[in-house]
Amino acid sequence: MEYMARPVKPNGAVAERNPERTRERILSAALQEFAANGFAGARVDAIARGAAINKRMLYHYFGNKEHLFREVLRRKITERQASAEGLSGDPAESLPFWFKLSCRDADWVRLLEWEALQEADNPLIDGAGRRALAIRALGRIRQQQALGYLAGEFEPRHLLLAMRSLTMFPMAFPQLARLITGQPVSNPHFQKKYAEFLKKFAAAFQSAGGRRNKTNFEN
């Protein structure tokens, strides 16, 4: 029977043997490290320290850094989808919702920014799975256009891209938002006013009559 050393905490104490709790600690520490430094800059030893385990134990749970990053992405996507359960597809509701979520979930925005900086010319990690989610989102938009809930003259891919941009740009480029508006994006007044703007601006996406239906545009 193979012997596996019990993980050691930074203070020298032996960590408790609780696989699920250990896994959660690893994912939490990995999210912080990937959000701070990106995939290329993240250090496995820093993640292990943050999770209060040794590197051997980390590799036992996730195999390698790429597998760990894939699991962090999968978990964040699942969390975001769960938070939108029951959300109406009416852009007047969904656009403010996704903007507010971006304000609360800065780690997600940072993950995407680091990925754009470091991996733009490389195949995306879990690219096939993420592309499948985007295709599903496009299918829902096309369905809503066919039913008359969204204006049919818009190219669905451009429509989805525009909606994502509107809800994430201020958090992705806070310095530009501050230059334009004179307010930091962390300012509750800015967030309130921009959410109100998105609700009004949403009418531009709707077909005449502005009928509503329940759809989730987030992938």
Regions found by a protein language model. Name each.
Residues M1-P10, F97-R104, I135-L147, S165-N219:
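C-terminal peripheral helix-coil segments that are non-catalytic and often amphipathic
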Residues R70-F97, A128, A134:
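Amphipathic alpha-helical linker/stalk segments
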Residues R75, L111-E115, A162, L166:
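Short acidic/histidine-centered micro-motifs embedded in hydrophobic/aromatic stretches
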Residues Q81-E85, D121-Y149, R157-H158, K192-E196:
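Amphipathic alpha-helical packing segments from all-alpha helical-bundle domains
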Residues C103-L124, F173-T181:
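Amphipathic alpha-helical segments used for helix-helix packing
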